[in-house]
Amino acid sequence: MSTTPPNPYSFNTRNPNRANPFPQIQTAPPVSENKNITTFPFKTPLPKHYNPALNTPYFTDITKRILTDFYPKKCPTPECNSRILDKEISTRPDLIRCPQCRYLTSRLSYTPLHHFKLPIWMFGFVLYESIIQYPKVVTATELSKKLRIGYNAASLLKRRFQLFASDQLPKYKTLTFNALEDKFRDFLLPPNENKDITSKMRNKPYVCVDTAVLYSAGERASQGRKRYSHRGQTSSIYLSEKLGGKQIGTLVQTIAVKHGPVFFTSVPNQKAETLEPLIKEHLPTSTPLFTDQGYPWLWGVYRNHRSVNHSARSKDNRFRFARNRWSKNGVHNQVAEGNHRVLKTAFASYGYIRPEYSQLYLNEFSFIKNANVFGLDILVGEGGGSCLSRDAFSSNARATARGAVRIGGKGSLFEKYPHLLAENIML
């Protein structure tokens, strides 16, 4: 009786991300067919999601550190007096208990990792990769290939990281507001708007506000129909009224500080009643604010508001636009424009984002940018409040060794594990 030889190649055609990295050639009968074999080859039992190319203990410690610092668990027993749970279980990294009364609970419950089914080291991997790859974004497709998981699992993993970023981003907003309030407490620009303010703003951070459109809807998306009820940038994010007028694009409001943090907000329009509360929530009224001429109503709110005319005409008939239409008398909004270029280049990797999920992606990008500026230790009170100093947003903050705003802040979390950092083969 002839038997069909086993397939020499084992491929998973339904999900290539779960397949082996190289074709596995069958050179010997399987163990199930030869019970007496005691030498090689034999099947080695490997844990699920095993990946020898990644230093999983390193990323596990990062996840534990994040959960301990940002979501500490306290013992509910009255005798323990709300003691923080810090006793780990070697075989259960998702559990933690009290060293005194042995109270046991999950360290993932009521956190962004609530009911997390994947290994917890994957969350630390997403945080690590997002910080070191900035301004490039980490997509779900990239995670599915590197972690060898399905695309849906990678999408949910990225969504959990976006929830964590959205939860911690208000802390950066408070730090920025307090630093700007302390920096420009009694600051006043000259009342004459035509006077050059370059010397007045020297060694001071420029705060710029602007809007941009992501994934705009052209006439092809509207099946060749024009849009009569919308004008300006708003017209490029809505479909034609005959097609229902649904929003398919994203309008982003940007608040950026030079050499400092940036905050992106998804807005439906550019009306004053929509943008004014957002700006007042992020910036104190004494801040020198620089925009284009799309914000004429800001002069009644911010006394140090200045605008530049991007459509200024040239006095020379040989040219259409003036040379100073981008920067005039020290007034410009290039800080916001530069962040728009970084944002558009990064979000091109996603292809398209639905408007209802746009704020999560913007919060993630803002959090990674601000983590590169402030660091992560400042969020848990280990920075000593140095970000509130008057040099927090200085123009030479990157050059200072101990400045509160510094790119070097992104390494503060990983410096807690120098022994693991030396062993990480991915570096």
Per-range role (PLM):
Residues 2-427:
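Residue-level recognition of single "structural anchor" positions
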